Amino acid sequence: PGGHGERSVAIGTIDMAVWDTVAKIEGKPLFQLLADRYGEGKPNRKIFVYAAGGDYYPGQDHGKLKDEMRSYIDRGYTVVKKKIGGASLDEDLRRIDSIMEVLQDGQKLCVDANGRFDLDTAIAYAKALSQYDLFWYEEPGDPLDFELQAALRNYYTNPMATGEDLFSMQDARNLIRYGGMRPDRDWLQFDCALSYGLVEYLRTLDMHKEHGWS
C-alpha cells in the first residue's frame, strides 16, 4: 500500500462501487447502510463543505476572481478556496486581498498549493500568509515530504491541511508521526475512494483516533 495512487484509486473505485451495489440490494441509502454497520445506526446528516475555485486562466483579472468567489458566497458557502503558486507570491497576495474584500463576518478563505513548493518557497508563503486569518494553508509541498510539512509549523501557526494525496493507513500514520500535524488546529484530508476503499479508510480513521484526532 501507498505510493502515488494508480493502484489504490483503482481498487478504491471498485470497492465503492461494490458498496453502492450492496446498499441497492438491501434497499437502503448507502449512508444509512454504513451508519448501521459502523455508526450505531445514526448517520451524521450534516457535513462540512466548501467551494473550491480560484484557478488561474487567461483573461482572469481580480474583478472576475471576486465575482467567482461572490457567486459561491451567494450560494450559501461560508468557506471558499483558491489556488496559490501559479503566479508570483506578490500576485498571489494581491489575489487574496481581492477575495478578502468579498468575504464578510463568518466567511473564510482556504489556499491550496497542490504540492508544488520546495521548502524555501513553502516557508516564504507561510510567512506571507500569516497576516491573514485563513481557514487553512493546504498541501504546500509533495505529500510524501513529511520533513517539509513538519518544518512549516515553525513558520505558520494557523491551520494547515494535507493528506488528500496519501492513499494508505501506513502513509497516513507516517504523516502523523513525522509531518508535525497538530490535532488542535490542522486538517487531515484523506479520501475514501482514493485510499483502497472503505476498509482501508476505516483503518486510517481508527489510527487517527489512537493518535488524538477527532
Sequence positions of predicted segments:
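Catalytic core of soluble alpha/beta enzymes
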Residues: K82-S214
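N-terminal capping/lid subdomain adjacent to the active-site entrance of alpha/beta enzymes
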Residues: P1-L109, N114-I123, K127-Q131
